[in-house]
Amino acid sequence: MIDGDGYRPNVGIVICNSHGQVFWARRYGQHSWQFPQGGIDEGETPEQAMYRELYEEVGLTKKDVRILASSRHWLRYKLPKRLVRWDSKPVCIGQKQKWFLLSLECDESRVNMQRGSTPEFDGWRWVSYWYPVRQVVSFKRDVYRRALKEFAAIAMPFKERKERKLKRYKSKRG
């Protein structure tokens, strides 16, 4: 399913833990890392697609996570010309993504990347909140930055937000 502008509807998933870290997954057989993501099927809502992709790619179910937020708008990125399949119709020039911020509500041992028919990932780790913006493939960086910026106030632990406010207060007074 590709829209009239050549973008494939897709969901992006940011899973955070109680320490403000995010789930960072290594693409199967590659050295590249990214957040879980995947296409929205015909007749599927973005939320339904998110839960399906979450299970297929990470092995987690609806009861394992809690939705904290979703992006207000679709965030788009264009594929580099070398990755566009010009011979397929309609031509897909990029992805438009609805992003979801989830909190992990279960033990991390429930993560199982072998649940889908073809594994997307072969490893994962927790990383600092902003780390993915610097590490993801370059053509996705702006979308990652925008999604994480939108979710930052919700995802960052309360303690960290409180410490930042205290620092700002002290610097204004001192």
Curated annotation (Swiss-Prot):
GO terms for biological process: mRNA catabolic process. One of its GO terms (molecular function) is mRNA 5'-diphosphatase activity. Coiled coil: none annotated. The keyword Kinase does not apply. One of its GO terms (cellular component) is cytoplasm. A motif (Nudix box) lies at residues 38-59. It comes from the Bacteria. InterPro entries: Nudix_hydrolase (IPR020476), NUDIX_hydrolase-like_dom_sf (IPR015797), NUDIX_hydrolase_CS (IPR020084), NUDIX_hydrolase_dom (IPR000086), RppH (IPR022927). Its EC number is 3.6.1.-. Belongs to the Nudix hydrolase family. RppH subfamily. This is RNA pyrophosphohydrolase. It comes from Photobacterium profundum (strain SS9). The lineage of its organism: Bacteria, Pseudomonadati, Pseudomonadota, Gammaproteobacteria, Vibrionales.
